[in-house]
């Protein structure tokens, strides 16, 4: 597929497909790189020095991530978004645990539900499976699973389903301004 130079409606620098003259969509690789870069910039602005590692076979699930990294599944940070009324709340949960929705609702003092994919994307700017613990579209109230504190190092998503980064749990709590609360089982 050829590419036209930017002219007319593409003067902003966008490129067009020669056959259709429609704007060319960015590749998924470019979007993934942008997501990682956006996360990395936000993490460093929050005081975290991150070293993102990419795994082509994916780290979408906690088990996938643990296998790729070579750690225990409990050292994987699951970033789960819940809706508390109309406000999104982020729960950073140990990979081998599940959020106890009754405990979370009790802690938040309101009814909750797991957020849908479009709500996660709107609140965080990232897709499910690659949602990092910070760098979101809107500031999120964050709840951190105390079981993550049992480890010297944990691994969290870095913006894409194939990227993770290591972090000390105490640094994660500080960077996210998270509340360490027992809402898992």
Regions found by a protein language model. Name each.
Residues 2-185:
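Extended, low-hydrophobicity, polar/charged segments
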């Amino acid at each position: 597929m050829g590419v036209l130079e930017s002219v007319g409606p593409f003067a902003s620098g966008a490129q067009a497909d020669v056959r259709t003259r429609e704007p060319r969509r960015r590749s998924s690789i470019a979007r993934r790189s942008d997501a990682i870069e956006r996360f990395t910039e936000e993490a460093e602005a929050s005081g975290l020095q991150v070293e993102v590692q990419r795994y082509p076979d994916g780290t979408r699930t906690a088990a996938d991530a643990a296998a790729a990294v070579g750690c225990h599944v409990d050292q994987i940070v699951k970033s789960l978004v819940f809706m508390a009324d109309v406000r999104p709340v982020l729960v950073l949960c140990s990979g081998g645990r599940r959020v106890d929705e009754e405990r979370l609702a009790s802690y938040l003092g309101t009814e909750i539900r797991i957020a849908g994919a479009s709500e996660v994307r709107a609140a965080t700017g990232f897709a499910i499976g690659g949602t990092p613990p910070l760098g979101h579209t809107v500031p999120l109230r964050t709840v951190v699973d105390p079981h993550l504190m049992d480890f010297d190092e944990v691994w969290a998503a870095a913006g894409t389903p194939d990227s993770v980064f290591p972090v000390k749990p105490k640094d994660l709590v500080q960077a996210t301004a998270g509340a360490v609360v027992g809402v898992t089982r």
